[in-house]
Amino acid sequence: MRFRVILGKADDLKADVLFQMSVPASAETPLALEGFLTGPTSTRASTLPVHQKIRIHSQRVVGEGTEILGHSILTEPAFWTPNVPMLYFVKCRITSSGKELALLSQTTGLRRLGIRNHSLWLDGHRFVLRGVTCSNRDYSSAEQQPAAPEDHRTADVLDLPAEVFSETDSVELEIDENLKTADEIGRPIIIRLHPKSPPSVIPSVICRLASHPSVFLTVIPNTLLPEVSKFSAYKGTMLFAKETHAKFAPPELPNGIDLAVVRLSQSVPDSSWKTPPPYPVIAWQTGVPSQRQECDRLQALLANWRTAPKGPPSSWDWAGYFVGDETIPHQA
């Protein structure tokens, strides 16, 4: 069953939360939904729990299945941030004439992530994304846990191998358990899809990734860019990025892509980047260690470049900084 959480109109007092469920079976009679939203829980904070009913907002036949849209209203909602990773638990049971068709139990988080001008904004504040490349790290082992509270804000950049994709709608990701742990500890995650990913399963993959509040950004390879408008509707508040190289002029982004990740093989970008593009840009320095302090070094280096003569306007700055080498090349 394909499932995704949609955060509607939300503020500190109230949040409209929608739950889209695609059941791979059509029924002669309308389906019934018994669902509840409970929480929040967090590894760093506590608050009074709620037990909110999920009601059917609408349902329709789509292809050979049925799509149900559930709805719940939360008062004084708790939103997910790296500092305070608040999580809710969703449990839904879908029946037809008393017969169970699908059962769902899943944790999720409500994350207010978006773009304002050239920056990322999280929960009403500018958020500079700093990340290091790594393999599919096992967060369940003690040695992989963050060494200090301030480290949880550093994102992991993960390459998603093509082997994790399935030709069925119930796509199982090898890193799913690690993403759940990242949700709990508040570590942002950047996902790079494999260039050989089959387009037919991408909507299910995007729904799966978007259900994890820790997954801030998914990098779409060039091979999937022609299809991006078809599956961008599934991403919710998760952002899509395109990779490019700093030796080329800033590209025009396809519809559905929110920002660019610019690869730096030299110390500074081409001079054409001193005229900022109309979208956020994250700088990625390869050939350096995958360490948090390298993000600071890159930020200082690019700050000098930015303030040099004929540099970008003082109101512009980079939206984030990645360091380290990738394991899956996206470009030749």
Language-model-derived ranges and their functions:
Residues M1-I191, P199-D258, R263-A332:
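Secreted/periplasmic carbohydrate-active enzymes, especially glycoside hydrolases
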